[in-house]
């Protein structure tokens, strides 16, 4: 049997694994771990995240906010990396579907946000 799980940021992979093994042992079930990744979390209070939120707010005029995801994103192994974009409130969520698309207006707004974020993060926005 294959068991896939994501670990909360408040516990290490080793801690969860030892608890699972202890819970399964009385039932004669062995747990073999093939792959494990430590949880990835970047605080909303980090300077990096604050700059990204500032750019979003400056470009859109809307209040930015952070969302914690349980999924494994492309930034999981990037220290202090965060996923940023690309959907806006009210957009149809069609990411990763067979007919994936983005509205032209959203694509252009994302490009403007990303360009400004790069400038801000590089200190070139003055």
What residue ranges belong to the model's regions?
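Short amphipathic alpha-helices in soluble, non-transmembrane regions
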Residues: 14-26
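Active-site pocket-shaping loop/turn-to-helix segments
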Residues: 11
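Hydrophobic beta-strand positions in extracellular immunoglobulin-like domains
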Residues: 5-7
